């Protein structure tokens, strides 16, 4: 799905890592939430509360989930992160993403 309809968007950005990772929250009528964001090249570590689905819309990166090896992710691919966990990212070029909160 490349477009969302009937949503509310929080105007204030979510800003992480001195502005190198930013996103906007999109709220759906059914109570679910997604964030749409951009990550600049760099190394980052995130913690999760809810289970997440990360869809990579454009970019080039590697991800490491807890207890797993690094793996390459490209535009058009996605990965899931368990609830109450963490993951590491190596961003090699500007990356556009959509994060869905599943829990």
From Swiss-Prot:
Keywords: Glycosyltransferase, Transferase. Belongs to the nucleoside phosphorylase PpnP family. GO terms for molecular function: guanosine phosphorylase activity; purine-nucleoside phosphorylase activity; thymidine phosphorylase activity; uridine phosphorylase activity. This is Pyrimidine/purine nucleoside phosphorylase. It holds the Pfam family Ppnp. The lineage of its organism: Bacteria, Pseudomonadati, Chlorobiota, Chlorobiia, Chlorobiales. Catalyzes the phosphorolysis of diverse nucleosides, yielding D-ribose 1-phosphate and the respective free bases. Can use uridine, adenosine, guanosine, cytidine, thymidine, inosine and xanthosine as substrates. Also catalyzes the reverse reactions. GO terms for cellular component: cytosol. It comes from Chlorobium chlorochromatii (strain CaD3). It comes from the Bacteria. SUPFAM superfamilies: RmlC-like cupins. Its EC number is 2.4.2.1, 2.4.2.2. The keyword Membrane does not apply. It catalyses: a purine D-ribonucleoside + phosphate = a purine nucleobase + alpha-D-ribose 1-phosphate; adenosine + phosphate = alpha-D-ribose 1-phosphate + adenine; cytidine + phosphate = cytosine + alpha-D-ribose 1-phosphate; guanosine + phosphate = alpha-D-ribose 1-phosphate + guanine. Gene3D superfamilies: Jelly Rolls. The keyword Glycosyltransferase applies.
